[in-house]
A protein has these predicted regions:
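Hydrophobic-ligand binding "helix-grip"
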Residues: 28, 44, 54-104, 108-113, ...
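A conserved amphipathic terminal alpha-helix motif
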Residues: 109-151
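Hydrophobic alpha-helical core bundles mediating ligand binding, dimerization, or RNAP-core interactions
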Residues: 21, 31, 67, 107, ...
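Hydrophobic ligand-binding cavity/cleft-lining segments
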Residues: 1-41, 136-142, 149-151
Length: 151
């Protein structure tokens, strides 16, 4: 099991940041590796909500995501599965700070098959990818007021 963690400050209210991230269908707007993401359960977002995401890096493989913990606006817990590639479990935490939100993440990544051989590389690459993704989110939320209109 590999751990990937980090944090970032976002100059937006904690409720806005939480709501935007909790709706996984927003992720293609700030994660260039996610082609699209669809909510496959009905009802409001919460524990049990599931998504299917199409990633560039996995070719035809779908990433199945399920929300396993939901405490608005402080905690979002999920698990993701990419068949034959990896499982990811983790949490994103949100803290109100002066001027915005401190967002921290921690993922446990379990590679499968030949991906297990790339363990240390997955950790380094994963850390860089997460920093890139969350920095892109920060830029989107801080510079584009219309980004939150869809929430």
């Amino acid at each position: 099991m590999r751990k990937i963690n980090g944090q970032i400050e976002i100059s937006r209210p904690v409720e806005e940041v939480f709501d935007f991230i909790a709706d996984e269908t927003n992720e293609p707007r700030y994660n260039e590796d996610m082609v699209r993401c669809e909510k496959v359960t009905s009802g409001p977002i919460g524990v049990g909500t599931r998504y299917e995401a199409h990633m560039k890096s996995t070719g035809a493989a779908l990433m199945a995501v399920e929300v396993t913990g939901y405490e608005r606006p402080w905690l979002l817990v999920s698990r993701a599965h990419i068949e034959g590639v990896m499982d990811v479990r983790g949490a994103v935490r949100f803290e109100a700070i002066p001027g915005g939100t401190l967002m921290s993440w921690e993922w446990d990544v379990e590679p499968h098959g030949c991906m297990r051989l790339l363990g240390p590389f997955i950790t380094r690459m994963g850390r860089r990818n997460e920093e890139r993704i969350w920095t892109s989110l920060k830029t989107l939320l801080e510079t584009r007021k219309d980004a939150l209109a869809a929430v």
